[in-house]
């Protein structure tokens, strides 16, 4: 469902084309399908539609497919990278966003095929090129995972 922004307000939805222009991840490791509710330098919501065709389900686990928890965390981190890239207008050709640390990570529910992960992420602190985030991965109204992490912007040239 696409939401229309009020007159005079920039749209807050980011489609897959823009996501791919902003972060270097590609299928099968691109774990964000779209973003919405973007508020520059503050927050964003990432969306991942988890299908039975995801390559990790072939081995995790064939008889009871579950999205690996580390990939749920990676999806949240990619969502934060989109937030940083769009907020800071980072040129992907000259900069990269690297995951630095992970704290208070909890897995609350399995993520199975057919789930739609809704990942609200917010900036909790920033200093120079280092940003701290807090986020959750939600399935409907249930928390599947939650964590806090840090990332930094680095020059690649």
PLM features: residue spans?
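Hydrophobic core residues within well-ordered beta-strands of beta-rich domains
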Residues: 29-31, 117, 131
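Beta-strand-rich interaction surfaces with strong enrichment in secreted/lumenal proteins
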Residues: 20, 63, 106-109
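Conserved positions in beta-strands of structured domains
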Residues: 33-36, 103, 108, 120-124, ...
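HotDog/MaoC-like acyl-thioester-processing domains
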Residues: 1-11, 40-41, 111-115, 122-157
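Active-site helix/loop of acyl-thioester processing domains in fatty-acid/polyketide metabolism
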Residues: 35, 67-91
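N-terminal leader/capping segments at the start of a protein or of a new domain
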Residues: 1-31
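Catalytic strand-loop segment that frames the active site of acyl-thioester-processing enzymes
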Residues: 24-67, 72
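Hydrophobic beta-strand-centered segment that forms part of the acyl-chain substrate-binding groove
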Residues: 4-13, 80-118, 144, 152
